[in-house]
Amino acid sequence: MFLFLSALTAPALAQEGPGSNPIIRDKFTADPAPMVDGDRLYLYVGHDEAQRDEMFNMREWLAYSTTDMKHWTDHGPIMHVSDFKWAKKDAWASQTIKKNGKYWFYAAVEHDNTHPGKAIAVAVSDKPTGPFVDAKGSALITNQMTPKGTHSWEDIDPTVFTDDDGTTWIAWGNRQCYIAKLKPNMIEIDGPIREITPAHFEEGPWLHKRGKLYYLTYASLDRASHRDERISYATASSLNGPWTYRGELTGSGKYSFTIHAGIAEFKNEWYIFLHNAALAIGDLNGAIGRRAVTVEHLEYNADGTMKPVMQTDAGVSAPPSGK
């Protein structure tokens, strides 16, 4: 299905052109995770289905793709949480990467009562749009593997990154941020799990590299001064750290307590995907469990730091500020 989803929501949104925000307008979506494969950028999102006073109701993950950042193809659901037979509920944040000719999908779910709490699942497919199947038959990471946390949702929001030497790393967490290597089979942790929690870390880590610098971007919450999450980041010359806090990259998402970043370089331009709660569909307004994915240009300073990102309605329909 080929779409620019403008006509299916409030009139104020319907007047915006291709590339404007939000990207997806016929469904509530959250936790964007881009992946570039050839001349196409794929975007994986969680499907927010909360009704009225529900907090979160997320049962499936969706995929979209584009070749120009303005027109998007809807590939439909790629997995349901029930596809992980050991999982109980909650199709939370995910990321997909390509390695060795296959597509590996990592996602946070609620484990059944054999391992209570949140867990990280891994699935695999021969195609970026699926079908994906459980690659392990059990969780990659469970709450019992990170005993420092004081809450059952510590092990969420995986980000996966393959370094130049071919080693794949996974980072994740809520309140604490953890990192570990993956074995070449992509379904087992290789070595120790280490904590790398940067300043004000709340959740939603995202790893990427530009030049020789590694970036850890994440949802931050300074409880002394803020009520809603913002995006902050840290940098390092090695994934082993030390990580240097670089400050806030964005403000909070409009009408949303949560925010979640995904970053990609596509056709020589950098982009940051986010979510807010500014979309209305029919008689349902945006809310904590009804969010909308957006995209903005991402620019860098000469020293490698990222320029602050303003969240806009125009999105990438407008050129980046440096051009």
Question: Where do the model's predicted regions map?
Answer:
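Bacterial N-terminal signal peptides
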Residues: 1-10
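Carbohydrate-active catalytic/glycan-binding domains of CAZyme proteins
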Residues: 13-323
